[in-house]
Amino acid sequence: DKTAYELVGIARDKDRPKITEYIDKLFDGFTELKGDRLGSEDGSILGGIAFFHGMPVTVIGHRKGHDTEENRELHFGMASPEGYRKAMRLAKEAEKFNRPIICFVDTPGAYPGLDAELHGQPGAIAESLAMFSSLTVPVISIVTGEGGSGGALALSIADEIWMLENAVYSILSPEGFAAILWKDAKRAAEASELMRMTSREILKTGIIDGVLPEGEDMYDEMDRMLVSELGKLTRLDKRTLVSRRYEKYRSIGNF
């Protein structure tokens, strides 16, 4: 078995599939939609309309680059407030046209730059949490790599949340956790064990609903799960969908 910190390394691997690969493998006719309609565009959030087995859906997710230069342009998948506002715009559009939403989460966290703070990063994330919680269309979120902090949570308020088996999901990086707790980022491996950030540990807490295996059959299994769960969720009326989502999040955690 791999250690938690080994899984962190796998989740961060530059060769892991990106959102563009998932779109190519799972959907047909993807059309990208850009801009937050407030004058800005953030490429670290990719979103648009596609068909899933003939069903119109909205796809939204974090976008990482395939090389260092592209990653710098995309802030390594760390979205700005403009990116989250774009995601919210697309989600509201999906609600208007009764399209299910499928989110792909892969980010170290929200972009921490000065401009992001000045443009309202905390508020944008909070607005996203509130809006996704009240959407009247099905939402499925899949953590495919790094699920870091509020940057990941902003696209993780969903009716179903799944993780790939080698993905991680946490309040912050193990290096940051170690630096805060022990003033020593070199103890990241130790911190990652305490944080219970692996897919199997997160599943035990009830935060996620399933773990998807990786390997040759990964896309086929993901397709089967999406077909099954969308079939169930699209049969629910709007009131039941929102109420069910509310109860789901009220029941998470130990008190």
Q: Each predicted region: which residue ranges?
A:
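Alpha-helix capping at helix-to-loop junctions
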Residues: 32, 93-96, 110, 134
